């Protein structure tokens, strides 16, 4: 077993050796530009790009013509949300999303608000899932876009996307789904889920970083305004020379996900349950955040009461975990996702996200259980609040002195 142990698979995944192997020739011998139509170097590159497009499409039940390459899911989210809003704004300027979306969606929505659009931010239930009835109630005659993620990046909670998509489709509203954390882990089918636009990332499914895709439905056709001008690549949706090695890597990652996903999900779920039960046996006052029933296989988001999440992370340097999402973990604010779910500020501050994946082992899980048990107990020994609770004091009944 190698130390440190990687348990942050929602932040990124290692590149699968089979993916790297598929990519390497496109750095060295097959280095053509896929847009060069006049010679064999270009044709070979284009062939590889189209084969990868086919693989990504197959993974989500789409046609290859509906896949647009991007530099990653942040760009896909921006292109989907802003591109759809700008194209359909003559029809209306109202957008609907959820408070627990990824920052790439939320900040795109805030940018559109500054341009005169109106956004309804819906609250999830206590278990982290969004009730489709709330989406239905939020729709107005001038609503042009609904954007709801499939699986949350912090809690791993899976939203009822098929139902939300059906509601949007029935109202003639474009439906975008950020499917970054679910694709490759659980089934995702654009037809069954009534999705019009879907964001996909390579590095969340054992592919390279800086590589993504956007699914854009053709029937009924969804239109977007391009957010980047240039040579008109990718049917004008996304100009810029194609990253052929990255695309080949994403295609291979998609193929492996399609072939191995279901068996992998069973194994990783068993590891997660081993971790959860082990931690619950070692420690008291431990809360799992979000629905355990509706959740991606490798995610465990836990609050350790009376322990500061950041302090705990410093204490367990041998295990790579995170508090909050990797994109916002540099700020010491409590997780906005957990706060939107109604988790108290104290418990949100004490949350840790464990992410298990393809290369995680039972040995690593058992080591993590022992390490967290030891370190949490040590930190709680220094907590006067924990002492009081163990002595039977109800903290809610205490009148704290006002420091101001």
Curated annotation (Swiss-Prot):
Modification N6-(pyridoxal phosphate)lysine, positions: 204
Active site feature: 327 (cysteine persulfide intermediate)
Pathway note: Cofactor biosynthesis; iron-sulfur cluster biosynthesis
Domain of life of the native organism: Bacteria
SUPFAM superfamilies attached to this UniProt entry: PLP-dependent transferases
Gene Ontology CC terms: L-cysteine desulfurase complex
Residues forming coiled coils: none
Reactions catalysed: (sulfur carrier)-H + L-cysteine = (sulfur carrier)-SH + L-alanine
Listed cofactors: pyridoxal 5'-phosphate
Location of this chain's protein in the cell: Cytoplasm
Gene Ontology biological process terms in this record: [2Fe-2S] cluster assembly
Example GO molecular function: cysteine desulfurase activity
Entries under InterPro entries matching the protein: Aminotrans_V_dom, Aminotrans_V_PyrdxlP_BS, Cys_deSase_IscS, Cysteine_dSase, PyrdxlP-dep_Trfase, PyrdxlP-dep_Trfase_major, PyrdxlP-dep_Trfase_small
Annotated pyridoxal 5'-phosphate binding sites: 73-74, 153, 181, 201-203, 241
Primary site of residence: cytoplasm
Keywords from the UniProt entry: 2Fe-2S, Cytoplasm, Iron, Iron-sulfur, Metal-binding, Pyridoxal phosphate, Transferase
Residues given in the record as [2Fe-2S] cluster binding sites: 327
EC number: 2.8.1.7
Subunit composition and interactions: Homodimer. Forms a heterotetramer with IscU, interacts with other sulfur acceptors.
Described purpose of this protein according to its UniProt entry: Master enzyme that delivers sulfur to a number of partners involved in Fe-S cluster assembly, tRNA modification or cofactor biosynthesis. Catalyzes the removal of elemental sulfur atoms from cysteine to produce alanine. Functions as a sulfur delivery protein for Fe-S cluster synthesis onto IscU, an Fe-S scaffold assembly protein, as well as other S acceptor proteins.
Family, as annotated: Belongs to the class-V pyridoxal-phosphate-dependent aminotransferase family. NifS/IscS subfamily.
Record protein name field: Cysteine desulfurase IscS
């Amino acid at each position: 077993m190698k130390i440190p142990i990687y348990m942050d698979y929602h932040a990124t995944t290692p590149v699968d050796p089979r993916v790297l192997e598929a990519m390497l020739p496109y750095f060295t011998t097959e280095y053509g530009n896929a847009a060069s139509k006049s010679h064999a170097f270009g044709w070979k590159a284009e062939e590889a790009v189209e084969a990868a497009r086919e693989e990504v499409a197959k993974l989500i039940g789409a046609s290859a013509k509906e896949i647009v390459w991007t530099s990653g899911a942040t760009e896909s989210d921006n292109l989907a949300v802003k591109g759809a809003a700008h194209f359909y704004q003559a029809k209306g300027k109202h957008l609907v999303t959820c408070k627990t979306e990824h920052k790439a969606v939320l900040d795109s929505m805030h940018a559109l608000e500054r341009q005169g659009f109106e956004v309804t931010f819906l609250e999830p239930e206590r278990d982290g899932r969004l009730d489709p009835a709330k989406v239905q109630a939020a729709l107005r005659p001038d609503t042009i876009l609904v954007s709801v993620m499939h699986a949350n990046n912090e809690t791993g909670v899976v939203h009822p996307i098929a139902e939300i998509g059906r509601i949007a489709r029935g109202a003639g509203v474009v439906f975008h789904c950020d499917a970054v954390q679910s694709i490759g882990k659980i089934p995702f089918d654009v037809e069954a889920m009534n999705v019009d636009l879907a964001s996909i990332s390579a590095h969340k499914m054992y592919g390279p970083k800086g590589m993504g895709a956007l699914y854009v439905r053709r029937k009924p056709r969804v239109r977007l305004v391009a957010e980047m001008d240039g040579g008109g690549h990718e049917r004008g949706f996304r100009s810029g020379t194609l990253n052929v090695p990255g695309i080949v890597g994403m295609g291979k990652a998609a193929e492996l996900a399609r072939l191995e996903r279901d068996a992998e999900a069973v194994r990783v779920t068993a590891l997660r349950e081993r971790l959860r039960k082990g931690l619950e046996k070692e420690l008291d006052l431990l809360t799992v955040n979000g629905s355990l029933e509706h959740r991606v296989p490798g995610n465990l988001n836990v609050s350790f009461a009376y322990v500061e999440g950041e302090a705990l992370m410093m204490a367990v340097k041998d295990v790579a975990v995170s508090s909050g999402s990797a994109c916002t973990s540099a700020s010491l604010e409590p997780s906005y996702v957990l706060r939107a779910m109604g988790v108290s500020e104290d418990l949100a501050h004490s949350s840790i996200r464990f992410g298990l994946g393809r290369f995680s082992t039972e040995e690593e899980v058992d080591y993590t259980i022992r390490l967290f048990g030891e370190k949490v107990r040590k930190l709680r020994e220094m907590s006067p609040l924990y002492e009081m609770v163990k002595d039977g004091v109800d903290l809610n009944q205490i009148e704290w002195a006002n420091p101001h």
